[in-house]
Amino acid sequence: MSQPTHTSQMLRSLLVSSRRCTGRGLFMDEAACVRQQHRGLDSADSHYDGLYPGHIPTNPIQKALLAVGSGVAALQDPYRHDMVAVLGETTGHLALMTLRDRMRGDPEGYTILTERPRIRLSTLDLSKMASLPDGSFGREYLRFLEDNRVTPDSRVNVKFVDNEELAYVMQRYREVHDLLHTLLGMPTNMLGEVAVKWFEAAQTGLPMCILGAALGPLRLSTSRLEPLVTSLGPWAVRNGRQARCVLSIFYERRWEQSLENLREELNIEPPPLTIRATSQKATLDS
């Protein structure tokens, strides 16, 4: 099958399914529809239309449907990273352009856009990172991965961004997320994730981050909401606004740098609270 024919058939399939979705119940069925579309489109991951591998072209109507459906699914389950990813890609065009321009205006960010590094297990020297002294950025990042039982390979590839350079900016944001957890001293429990989202919302302006920052607190208990509102939230927003563009840092060349020194360079204050990775409970620093 020729490449244009394959793409046309895929788009027609998307449009037909989107028309079917609009005729059903709005909220419950749109989440189901976007999951159905996403599964159907996954088979096109290996397709290369000339923009970048795995790109899936969509028109504005299809993007809107995907945005609404993935948003509903993400609200129902914030740990549905595939739905969060679709929401970010279908709503973030303007914010991605701003982030791209900030990276272009920074020498280190420009180098990143030119060299296109990836943060994956295949690109990390875990043995070397484990040998670094405590307090170094690389050692603390590895400790974060171990303590929270996460892996950089869990970040899915971008599919729905219709610009190759902006697609990389989104991918870089996605792969830098766990590094931000390390920089901010936040675990991956709900309180830690919401605090990071408040930082990201102020730093990136991505609609997905703003939505997560606004709605994430609704999933917190009263005891966990109090430290967010009185301490973690204001700290996260303030630092998100004042920090250097976090996408413009070549973290792969900073593993040996001390975490404290890197925070100072980025103009990020140490967290006001210590949150244990094994518990949702926040405790004040002594």
Q: Would you name each region that the model predicts?
A:
Residues 60, 110, 273-275:
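A generic alpha-helix propensity feature with a strong bias for hydrophobic helices
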Residues 19-21, 36, 46, 50, ...:
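Compositionally biased, low-complexity repeat tracts
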Residues 1-54, 286:
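N-terminal mitochondrial targeting presequence
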Residues 260-285:
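Charge-dense, extended regions
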Residues 23-24, 36-39, 71, 166, ...:
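Generic secretory/membrane-interface signal
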Residues 76-264, 268:
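Core of folded catalytic or high-affinity ligand/protein-binding domains
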Residues 26-28, 72, 188:
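Polar low-complexity intrinsically disordered regions enriched in Ser/Thr and small residues
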Residues 36-96:
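Leu/Val/Ala/Ile-rich N-terminal alpha-helices, chiefly Sec-type signal peptides and the beginnings
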